[in-house]
């Protein structure tokens, strides 16, 4: 980012905004390529199991970025995992205890509010965030950058629905 700031330092404000927007679009394309080749359910379980290791105790934010659809995250091998099926597995009880979990995937939280609360209760997550509709990659990247920063900067924050803000 430093080289970006130097290269646009003397340009007009509008030009800077366009340049930054283009930089976000390029970065989002790179992220999109990574997401497309990301994981299978087996890979997902491998990394989720690591959360039980003491060396991960300090991590209080779990950011899960996949393709998504109603109530599910989708893997590169064209399979999907229903959130409630994940939460209801005995080995996942309390898996996110005290942590904030963000699903950076389209429509994953398009489910009944009671089910989201049950997911939170079963996994013991502190907070669950994500999308109830399909979102474009650039907008979601910008929003998630803000969200991660807000969570990181504010220990005493409280969650609200975007519609309530």
Feature locations, PLM:
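Hydrophobic residues in alpha-helical segments
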Residues: 51, 151-152
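A domain-level signal for caspase-like cysteine endopeptidase catalytic cores
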Residues: 1-61, 80-82, 96-98, 102-104, ...
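Active-site microenvironments of hydrolase-like enzyme catalytic domains
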Residues: 60-74, 127
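Catalytic cores of nucleophile-dependent amide-cleaving enzymes
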Residues: 78-141
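Gly/Ser/Thr-rich helix-start
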Residues: 44, 69, 131
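A conserved mid-domain beta-alpha-beta active-site/ligand-binding segment of alpha/beta enzyme cores
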Residues: 153-165
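Short acidic, S/G/P-rich loop/turn micro-motifs used as interaction or catalytic elements
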Residues: 9-14, 68-72, 107-111, 134-136
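Short, surface-exposed amphipathic charged segments that create phosphate/polyanion-binding patches used
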Residues: 49, 141-148
């Amino acid at each position: 980012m430093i080289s970006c700031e130097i290269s646009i330092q003397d340009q007009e404000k509008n030009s800077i905004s366009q340049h930054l927007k283009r930089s976000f679009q390029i970065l989002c394309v790179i992220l999109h390529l990574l997401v497309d080749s990301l994981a299978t359910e087996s890979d997902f379980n491998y990394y989720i199991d690591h959360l039980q290791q003491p060396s991960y105790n300090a991590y209080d934010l779990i950011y899960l970025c996949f393709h998504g659809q109603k109530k599910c995250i989708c893997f590169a091998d064209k399979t999907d995992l229903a959130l409630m099926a994940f939460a209801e597995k005995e080995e996942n009880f309390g898996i996110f205890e005290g942590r904030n979990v963000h699903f950076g995937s389209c429509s994953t939280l398009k489910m009944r509010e009671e089910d989201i609360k049950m997911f939170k209760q079963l996994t013991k997550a502190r907070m669950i965030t994500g999308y109830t509709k399909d979102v474009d990659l650039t907008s979601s990247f910008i929003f998630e950058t803000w969200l991660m920063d807000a969570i990181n900067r504010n220990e005493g924050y409280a969650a609200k629905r975007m519609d309530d803000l």
